[in-house]
From Swiss-Prot:
The gene is ausG. Cytochrome P450 monooxygenase; part of the gene cluster B that mediates the biosynthesis of the fungal meroterpenoid acetoxydehydroaustin. The first step of the pathway is the synthesis of 3,5-dimethylorsellinic acid by the polyketide synthase ausA. 3,5-dimethylorsellinic acid is then prenylated by the polyprenyl transferase ausN. Further epoxidation by the FAD-dependent monooxygenase ausM and cyclization by the probable terpene cyclase ausL lead to the formation of protoaustinoid A. CDD domains: CYP503A1-like (cd11041). This is Cytochrome P450 monooxygenase ausG. It comes from Penicillium brasilianum. It is an enzyme of class 1 (oxidoreductase).
Length: 530
């Protein structure tokens, strides 16, 4: 699970980019006709939007200012370029300066070179929380889940302390459930079958996380899992579509757009499933039931009491799901593709199988056996290095004007990101564009403490860095290793006969495992039972 700032500038579908200015005004006209909105007020709002000048908040160069006579046209063109070409824009910006600005759907943001990562990660006046309000319009019903991003100590402390401490106890549950889920997806066919690594990873990991977060009964409820995975997939696209509209009109548009109405239904339906479970537990405890529950329902409640902070049980669960489902499944899906795309894939998979057998034989799953999966740890970190989750990362909001150590000025109210390019820096990683499976195993043998998958460093910020590094990365690492071990021991994998290397899907800041990619799997006899 990754408690990162997911979805900033995200767009999981391209429908918002295809909307265009013409279709936007057509939709606006339909509002006037269908709902008889006050024309003068609407015309006044549009006039302000069209002729509003771009405010200059910083002297840093602006990379994608766009062209057009009105700010709305410039903004639309900038957002369109941003959504489709962010890697190019970041490279262009870094070729000009170590700090620059990029126009994004939520405004003009500052992007910094990786050399600033440590300073940004530790600065007390740079925090991720307020970013969500701008990007996800958290004041609008349907998007209130994101209001807790970077602001809820209850969630972050529950993950950092309660979840991380339970990893060893949770391992038997995760491995037994993985066996059932994987068999339901890949079956036992002795012949090659084509599957989607992206869909398989999402299916398995969403259900594993649900079991950990809400317990056996609700965690296995297909309605609950469907609601949370659907919200996870659809909320980002809905936010991106909404951000095409000026802020003054967004509450009205959100009230009418089907995608936003659907988000509100998901929240309502999820609450109807969760609250009775919580009430039943409270009632049982009031009657003397001393049963202990090892799930996030209890961790959140206990942490809330210890911190003396309030929280919303449903919204907290939905945010945990967002942090967990997407990032972990993206890493697992990508590493399956990376293994299959290697010319020596059979050799590498064989080495991984030997390591799994050696680590588990005679002892089973425990903290030591997971730690002994050193080659797998390196393979996962190398996959994340070559295809991180995003082009820019470590989103932070400046609560006051900040002067960095080199004199760079960050105006108050600015959103700041770090360009995620250090992981391809040849000065840090020889042959940076080559997948080297044991790259980090070798570094660990030389005493490099940053060479572990869960290590956060300025040279590898796959899980962030500093005070707000992903607190759930230890759970995510264990979860992915367990599932990958089951996959490799029980199945052969390869690319389809006509398959080729598949590039990641670029969508705003996100670099996603290509959802259209396919691999072939067939059942094999595992050497040991796990």
């Amino acid at each position: 699970m990754a408690m990162v700032t997911p979805g900033l500038w995200a767009n999981f579908s391209h429908s918002s980019h295809e909307l265009g200015i013409a279709n936007g005004f057509e939709f606006l006209n339909s509002l006037l006709v269908a709902y008889r909105l006050p024309g003068l007020l609407l015309l006044f709002s549009i006039t302000i939007i069209l002729f509003q000048p771009l405010r200059k908040k910083s002297d840093l160069p602006l990379i994608n200012s766009g062209k057009g006579p009105f700010s709305i046209l410039r903004g639309y063109r900038s957002r369109k370029t941003f959504a489709a070409e962010l890697p190019r824009l970041v490279a262009e910006g870094l070729s000009k300066a170590s700090a620059f600005r990029i126009a994004a759907p939520d405004g003009v943001n500052i992007v910094l070179a990786p050399s600033y990562a440590h300073e940004i990660g530790e600065h007390p006046d740079l925090n991720p929380g307020p970013i969500a309000g701008d990007e996800f319009n958290c004041h609008i019903d349907g998007f209130e889940v994101f209001a807790q991003l970077g602001t809820s100590d209850v969630i972050s402390e529950s993950v950092r302390t309660r979840l991380t401490r339970q990893l060893t106890k949770l391992t038997p549950l995760l491995t037994s459930e993985t066996a059932l889920l994987l068999q339901s997806q890949w079956k036992d066919a002795p012949n090659w079958v084509e599957v989607s690594p992206h869909e398989t990873a999402m299916f398995i990991l969403s259900r594993l996380s649900s079991l950990v977060f809400v317990g056996d009964d609700l965690g296995r409820n297909p309605d609950w899992v469907h609601i949370l995975t659907s919200y996870n997939n659809e909320a980002f696209a809905a936010a991106e579509e909404l951000n095409l509209w000026p802020q003054i009109l967004r509450p009205l548009v959100a009230h009418l757009k089907p995608s936003c109405r659907q988000l509100r239904r998901y929240i309502r339906d999820a609450r109807a499933l969760l609250i009775p479970v919580i009430e039943q537990r409270h009632h049982a405890q009031s009657q003397g039931d001393r049963r202990e529950y090892n799930d996030a329902i209890e961790w959140l409640n206990e942490t809330s009491h210890s911190l003396a902070q309030s929280y919303d049980p449903l919204l907290s669960q939905m945010l945990l799901a967002i942090g967990s489902f997407h990032t972990s499944s993206d890493l697992l899906g990508q590493v399956l593709l990376d293994l299959c795309m290697r010319q020596d894939w059979e050799v590498l998979v064989g080495e991984l199988r030997k390591e799994i057998i050696s680590s588990l034989q005679g002892v089973g799953w425990d903290k030591i056996s997971l730690n002994n999966l050193k080659l797998m740890d390196s393979v996962l970190k190398e996959s994340q290095r070559l295809k991180p989750a995003s082009t820019v990362t470590m989103g932070r909001y400046a609560s006051r004007e900040i002067i960095l150590s080199d004199g760079t000025r960050i105006p108050k109210g600015s959103t700041v990101f770090i360009a995620n390019v250090a992981m391809r820096d040849p000065n840090i990683y020889p042959d940076p564009d080559v997948f080297i499976p044991d790259r980090f195993t070798t570094r660990r043998e030389k005493g490099d403490s940053s060479a572990y998958l869960v290590s956060a460093s300025p040279e590898h910020i796959g899980f962030g860095l500093g005070r707000h590094a992903c607190p759930g990365r230890f759970f995510a690492a264990n979860e992915v290793k367990i599932v990958l071990s089951h996959m490799l021991l029980k199945y052969d994998i390869k690319l389809p006969d006509n398959g080729a290397a598949v590039a990641p899907s670029t969508s705003g800041i996100f670099l996603e495992t290509n959802p259209n990619a396919r691999i072939c799997v067939r059942r094999r006899k595992e050497e040991i039972l796990i």
